[in-house]
Amino acid sequence: MQPRVLLVAALLVLLASARALEAEDPSLLDLMQGYMQHATKTAQDTLTSVQESQVAQRARDWMTDGFSSLKDYWSTFKGKFSGFWDSASEAQTTPASDAS
């Protein structure tokens, strides 16, 4: 009788350990799914950050180019009309000096 009792006890132990492993498998699966979701989110955040950085860089370049062009236009405008302004201011001061 003792061999049968030992056999039944061994089977019960194996059955209990199999159930314990089954209980651990879903939690291991949950851990892996959580890890994969975290890794996916991290990769997406990094990609978004890089894309936003590239967009921001393009915007900065566009603004710099725009201000540079505006400065060039202003310099050209000043260059063309500075002679006119200088001669106009001289013309205004000349009649006053002639009258005295």
UniProtKB/Swiss-Prot annotation:
Q: Please name the PANTHER family in this protein's record.
A: APOLIPOPROTEIN C-III
Which family does the similarity line name?
A: Belongs to the apolipoprotein C3 family.
- Provide the residue span(s) of the region labelled Lipid-binding: 68-100
Q: Tell me the organism's taxonomic lineage.
A: Eukaryota, Metazoa, Chordata, Craniata, Vertebrata
Biological processes per GO annotation: cholesterol homeostasis; lipid catabolic process; lipid transport; lipoprotein metabolic process; negative regulation of high-density lipoprotein particle clearance; negative regulation of low-density lipoprotein particle clearance; negative regulation of triglyceride catabolic process; negative regulation of very-low-density lipoprotein particle clearance
Instruction: Indicate what this protein is called per its UniProt record.
Output: Apolipoprotein C-III
Q: How is it modified after translation?
A: The most abundant glycoforms are characterized by an O-linked disaccharide galactose linked to N-acetylgalactosamine (Gal-GalNAc), further modified with up to 3 sialic acid residues. Less abundant glycoforms are characterized by more complex and fucosylated glycan moieties. O-glycosylated on Thr-94 with a core 1 or possibly core 8 glycan.
MF term (GO), any: lipase inhibitor activity
Identify the stretch annotated as signal peptide in this record. 1-23
Residues the record annotates as the site (May interact with the LDL receptor) are 41
Name a single GO cellular component: very-low-density lipoprotein particle
Keywords associated with the record: Chylomicron, Glycoprotein, Lipid degradation, Lipid metabolism, Lipid transport, Secreted, Sialic acid, Signal, Transport, VLDL
Which residues are modified by glycosylation? 94
Where in or outside the cell?
Answer: Secreted
Principal localization reads secreted
- Function comment: Component of triglyceride-rich very low density lipoproteins (VLDL) and high density lipoproteins (HDL) in plasma. Plays a multifaceted role in triglyceride homeostasis. Intracellularly, promotes hepatic very low density lipoprotein 1 (VLDL1) assembly and secretion; extracellularly, attenuates hydrolysis and clearance of triglyceride-rich lipoproteins (TRLs). Impairs the lipolysis of TRLs by inhibiting lipoprotein lipase and the hepatic uptake of TRLs by remnant receptors.
